[in-house]
C-alpha cells in the first residue's frame, strides 16, 4: 500500500494512504543502508491491525531539504515584504536559484503591500516578472489575496521560505490554523505539549500539503562548476543559441546573445548584474560554493 509520510517523531512515522493515516515503524534494512525516512517521502507500507504498519520501501526522492527535513517539495512560495523590511534583491535571487537548483517551482509572494504605495511597479516585482516567475500580492494579516494563494496549493507539497520579518508565520497561521502551527496535528495524539521540540509536518490544505515550518533556513549553494550557474537563470535559455561560443558564460565573451538581450532590455539588468557578481565570486574564490 502506498502513502506519504506526514510526520516523523521518535522512530514513528505517520503515513497517509487513500484509506487513513497509519502509525508505522521503518524496517531495520533502512538503518543498515543509512537511509532515514523523511516527511514528504512516498513510501510502500504493510498495514497491520489497529491502524499500525511497517514501512517496506522508500520511493525515489525528487529532492529534499535539510532544514526542515522534508522530501519531494514541488512548489515554494518565496515570501518578501515590500516594506519593513525592504526587499533585498540579491537575497531574493538566491532563493530563486535555490529553487531552480532543486527543481522546485517558485511563486513569489510580495507581502505588506499596504506599506508601499505603488507596489505593482516596485523594482522587485519588475525583476521577478521579467524573469518569468509567477507572483502574488498579499496583505496576510487581513487575508488579502489569500484565496488566490490557496488555489495554487492543490496537488503540491508546498514550502514557504524567505527572510525574517516578512510574514511567513502569519501566512502559515492563516493557512493551517494557529493551533496546528503550535502543537501539530498528530502531537495531540502523542500527548506532546506546544513547548516541546518542533518537528516539521505536512498539513493538508485545499487538496495539497503545506510544510508547517518555513524552509530554506540556510542558503549554501553548491555548484559542480562555474559553468553550471547560468543554467539556473531561466531567462537566459532563449538567447544562449545566439552566443558565438558554445561554452559562453555570458560574461566577458564577445558576441554573446545574453549580453545583447540585456542591452536591448529583453533581460532584466538587475538579474544579469547579480549573475555576473555571483559568477565572479565563484571564479575569484576558486570554489563552487556560494
Swiss-Prot record:
Q: What is the free-text note on the cofactor?
A: Binds 1 zinc ion per subunit.
Q: Where does GTP bind?
A: 111-114, 162-170
Write out the transmembrane intervals. none
What are its cofactors?
Answer: Zn(2+)
User: Gene3D superfamilies given for it?
Assistant: Nucleic acid-binding proteins (2.40.50.140), P-loop containing nucleotide triphosphate hydrolases (3.40.50.300), Probable gtpase engc, domain 3 (1.10.40.50)
GO BP annotations listed? ribosomal small subunit biogenesis
Q: Which PROSITE patterns match?
A: ENGC_GTPASE, G_CP
Which Enzyme Commission numbers does its entry carry?
A: 3.6.1.-
Positions that bind Zn(2+): 243, 248, 250, 256
Q: Which InterPro entries match?
A: G_CP_dom, NA-bd_OB-fold, P-loop_NTPase, Ribosome_biogen_GTPase_RsgA, RsgA_GTPase_dom, RsgA_N
Checking SUPFAM superfamilies in the record gives:
Nucleic acid-binding proteins (SSF50249), P-loop containing nucleoside triphosphate hydrolases (SSF52540)
* GO MF annotation, one: metal ion binding
* Domain CP-type G intervals: 62-219
Localization, per the record, is: Cytoplasm
Q: Offer a single GO CC term for the protein.
A: cytoplasm
**Pfam families, sorted:** RsgA_GTPase, RsgA_N
**Which keywords are on file for this protein?**
Cytoplasm, GTP-binding, Hydrolase, Metal-binding, Nucleotide-binding, Ribosome biogenesis, RNA-binding, rRNA-binding, Zinc
Keyword Acetylation in annotation: no
Function of the protein:
One of several proteins that assist in the late maturation steps of the functional core of the 30S ribosomal subunit. Helps release RbfA from mature subunits. May play a role in the assembly of ribosomal proteins into the subunit. Circularly permuted GTPase that catalyzes slow GTP hydrolysis, GTPase activity is stimulated by the 30S ribosomal subunit.
Family the UniProt entry places it in: Belongs to the TRAFAC class YlqF/YawG GTPase family. RsgA subfamily.
Quaternary structure note: Monomer. Associates with 30S ribosomal subunit, binds 16S rRNA.
Protein name per the record? Small ribosomal subunit biogenesis GTPase RsgA
Amino acid at each position: 500500500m502506498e502513502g506519504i509520510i506526514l510526520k516523523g517523531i521518535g522512530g514513528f512515522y505517520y503515513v497517509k494512504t487513500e484509506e487513513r493515516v497509519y502509525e508505522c515503524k521503518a524496517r531495520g534494512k533502512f538503518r543498515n543502508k543509512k537511509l532515514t525516512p523523511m516527511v514528504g517521502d512516498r513510501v510502500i507500507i504493510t498495514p497491520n491491525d489497529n491502524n499500525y504498519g511497517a514501512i517496506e520501501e522508500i520511493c525515489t526522492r525528487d529532492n529534499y531539504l535539510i532544514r526542515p527535513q522534508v522530501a519531494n517539495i514541488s512548489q515554494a512560495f518565496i515570501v518578501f515584504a515590500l516594506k519593513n523590511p525592504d526587499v533585498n534583491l540579491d537575497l531574493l535571487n538566491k532563493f530563486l536559484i535555490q529553487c531552480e537548483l532543486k527543481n522546485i517551482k517558485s511563486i513569489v509572494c510580495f507581502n505588506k503591500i499596504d506599506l508601499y504605495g505603488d507596489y505593482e511597479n516596485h523594482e522587485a516585482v519588475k525583476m521577478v516578472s521579467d524573469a518569468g516567475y509567477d507572483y502574488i500580492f498579499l496583505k496576510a494579516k487581513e487575508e488579502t489575496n489569500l484565496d488566490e494563494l490557496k488555489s495554487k496549493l492543490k496537488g503540491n507539497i508546498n514550502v514557504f521560505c524567505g527572510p525574517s520579518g516578512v510574514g511567513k508565520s502569519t501566512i502559515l497561521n492563516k493557512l493551517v490554523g494557529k493551533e496546528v502551527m503550535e502543537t501539530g496535528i498528530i502531537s495531540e495524539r502523542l500527548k506532546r505539549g506546544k513547548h516541546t521540540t518542533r518537528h516539521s509536518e505536512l498539513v493538508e490544505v485545499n487538496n495539497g500539503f503545506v510544510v508547517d515550518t518555513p524552509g530554506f533556513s540556510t542558503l549554501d549553494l553548491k555548484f559542480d562548476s562555474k559553468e553550471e550557474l547560468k543554467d539556473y537563470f531561466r531567462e537566459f535559455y532563449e538567447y544562449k543559441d545566439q552566443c558565438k561560443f558554445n561554452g559562453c558564460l555570458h560574461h566577458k565573451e564577445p558576441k554573446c546573445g545574453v549580453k545583447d538581450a540585456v542591452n536591448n532590455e529583453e533581460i532584466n539588468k538587475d538579474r544579469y548584474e547579480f549573475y555576473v557578481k555571483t559568477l565572479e565570486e565563484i571564479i575569484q574564490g576558486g570554489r563552487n560554493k556560494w
